[in-house]
Amino acid sequence: AAQEPGSRPDELRHRRDRALILLGFWRGFRGDELIRVRVEHLRLVPGEGMTCFLPRSKGDRQAQGNTYKVPALSRLCPVTATWEWIDAAGLTEGPLFRGINRWGHVGEEALHPNSLIPLLRRLLTCAGLPDAEEYSSHSLRRGFAGWANANGWDVKALMEYVGWRDVHSAMRYIDGGDPFARQRIEASLPETPALPGPAAN
């Protein structure tokens, strides 16, 4: 039988997808990093956020792993969304982001890389974003980099937060949305002063 709106599968998918988008965006993760996050590698830090350990990453040549700090926010909080998903799915270990079948059963395996991009595009289409088919597994990272740049983060701070070691990698993400720096310059231009009115005789 078809599932009714508001059913457990719908609720689980909503919580998973919300956690995936918010964690991916606010942490600046690529798609392959998101699907490698494991429940046992998350640690809550009361009043601050949580830490997320990835045993390996693209720039980790020594294979020592990296620990990323995820902030707790007053709105659109990635920490709250992540733990609500963990609680709803009853996860204790293993991959954080998994498939959910039509009956609401949460799988044991991580989402496959080939299923992540269609999932992301479907979520963006539902959110009303245009050209959703152009988004890729790097889009959440690119979106965060653009947001941070527009809100005054300098390149060094952004590199430290995301984990870039090469400034050229950072600039590829930053310059993509505003290659001529028009938006940044326009935003900092002073308002045109009002013309003085006619002088009284």
Segments (PLM) and residue ranges:
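Conserved catalytic core of the tyrosine transesterase superfamily
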Residues: 1-139, 147-201
